[in-house]
Amino acid sequence: MWVLALGGAFLAVAKACIFCRLQDHALANRLAQLNNQTKPKWKWKEWASPDFSAFALDEVSMKQVTEKTHRVLRVIEKKGSTSLIPLYWQWLQKTRIPQYTREALCAPVCRGSTILYNCSTCEGKEESCWPQKHCYPDSHDLWDARILLLCIFGIVLLSGVVSLQVEYLNLQAKDL
């Protein structure tokens, strides 16, 4: 029963971004073969979420994720260590794909708009780039930089006026 459930999980995640490009790597078939070799040691629901609709990647990122998955599966196939699949899959879903999604929608990669591929359907759609504040919430935008420069300029100007006044008073004291 567990083998069937695990097989269902692999088929469900077969809609993921890693299967959208580079078909010659046959990742879906290789993942199915690894699944057939697996004795279920883990609960598939804990790691194999079939919902990839929150993720969208550009062409370059999708190829990078596919190549990375190809290399990881090759290592798993050579070692015969199928227990690494859930760890890799969790890392992919929780860390790498969200990072690539953010990079694809933020400057400097994105300029105005970009074509992103939905990771569930593999269909491309033109999307607007995210605003700077959304991409880098802790960073200062151009308006903040202007205010900072004006404050620094004001402080320097004020210290210059104070310094000039002190020098003027010193010169007057020497003349007397």
From Swiss-Prot:
Cytoplasmic side: 168-176
Ranges of the Extracellular topological domain: 17-146
GO biological process: fusion of sperm to egg plasma membrane involved in single fertilization
Annotated disulfide bonds: C17-C119, C20-C122, C106-C129, C110-C135
One GO cellular component term: sperm plasma membrane
Protein localization: Cytoplasmic vesicle, Secretory vesicle, Acrosome membrane
Glycosylation sites per record: N36, N118
Modification note: N-glycosylated.
Keyword Disulfide bond: yes
Function in brief: Sperm protein required for fusion of sperm with the egg membrane during fertilization.
Protein name per its UniProtKB record: Sperm-egg fusion protein TMEM95
Native source species: Mus musculus (Mouse)
